Amino acid sequence: EYLEKYFLNEIAPVISPTIVGKRQPFPFLKNNEIYAVVVLQTKSGKEKLGIIPCSNTGFKRLVELPTAGTYMLAEELILHYIPEVFERYNIKAKSLIRVTRNADIDADALYDEDLDYRDFMAELIKRRKKLAPVRLELTREMDGEIVDVLCDYLELDSDYVFQVQAPLDLSFVFEIQDTLRKTPELFYEKRVPQKSSQFRDGEPVFPQIREKDKLLSYPYESMKPFLNFLREAANDKEVISIKMTLYRVAKHSKIVEYLIDAAENGKEVLVLVELKARFDEENNIEWSRRLEDAGCRVIYGLDGYKVHSKLCLVTKKSEGQVEYYTQIGTGNYNEKTARLYTDLSFMTANVEIGLEAAKVFQALSMEETVDNVQHLLVAPRCLQNKVLSMIDEEIACAKEGKEAYIGLKMNSLTDKKIIDKLIEASQAGVKIDMVIRGICCLIPGVKGKTENIRVRSIVGRFLEHSRIYIFGTQEREKVYIASADFMTRNTLRRVEVAAPVYDKDLKMQLEEMFITMLSDNQKARQEDSRGNYEIAEAQETPLNSQEFFYEQAYMRVTI
């Protein structure tokens, strides 16, 4: 009775049902919005298709019932009372549906150089909402003929139709999380990013970086030292310039605010804002406007390449000497995701690295790519080839009977050249360990091919996002942190930066992190020689690597 009254009083007056026919063409279905679809039968037996949009600002999606802690979704309520809406028809079948539309737009191919690039991207985002459907989801089983009719209207192949059991959009959970707090077992234990033991509180950041390279590990350690780094740079009279790449930033970003402060304080501020960061385009367009209005020089990347690197360079002039402070990260400059994703942030006053970072920014300013650096690995022209060269070094060592090793931590591995070279390394006897969360196009453990390769994936509370490359052992060992996965889109079609870690303590820290991830027996899955992933069994003490890293960060602060 309560639901019926709610439907009749709150929902029925504002919904807009449509019956598809000669005068009512099949409506445009918006991307990721929910619709109720119904097969109607007239008294003469003729069938028609009815559609009701279920996303409406006129009513709440989550309907709270009188019984405490009980809810119903508005779309399910609409579906239930569809006979009341189409009362002149018999209801033959009904379902909730959702269409996913293509989000890929080739901005470079469509761009007209006579147009302002930012305005062009803003217009392109509007166009994306009308791209072709790539998926149709249904919550109820429907007759094949009806599904075919929907596919015809949407110009979609039936292979891309999926029936799902769960609600089509789970975002309603955020609305009830405060109520659910009364049931603590439904939630993770609270984890607060800890202070980094590598930085001394209350002291300027720059002298500490000059004294020794630093490494922050998110989300176990706080992003605050990096924020302090930017804040100090914005206000330090000796700072000449700040240069930075931005790919995805928070909607309320202290990082961007500090860049604005720096420009207003008379610093030279160069910011590369990647307007092609998918689904962040609108946010980036808005920030680019604010940065430009504050006096920052804003550039938008390269024709044909996305700039995905996480690079920041602060240049100081102290007592007539130029100093370079470089920060290189594996993840975005985003305060929100720094609490949710595992990432690394490396800071150094190494002059040679600083000069190469300056070379990267100079190339980006001139719409060019870097092709000659000694320390950094910079895609698209000198990351893949240097990685292949380092794998070759391990192959040569293995053939000479020496210990050879490769350790890789990343999100995905799809680059065929690198995969082929890793297979060659395995065949030569190089031991290879890989922690790859997502796509891995290399199958390990195949006799005569990849028997020396071990692949595991860790999916835990935090999204594994850091990239670590390890080549060699002992005095030959090279360790890098990077923004790039080994996918051709990263190695050949993006500007990416990998940084060498020379500090012995930081190298050891990264090695220990990698070994811990290889020992995870709670959230890890091991890939077998058939490409299947199996749970890594806990043979000894249970080890959740993410929990371990947090406990380590907490212990370092409290000791």
Regions found by a protein language model. Give the residues of each.
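N-terminal localization/anchoring segments of enzymes in phospholipid and broader phosphate metabolism
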Residues: 1-406, 424, 428, 440-464, ...
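Hydrophobic alpha/beta core scaffold segments
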Residues: 431-435
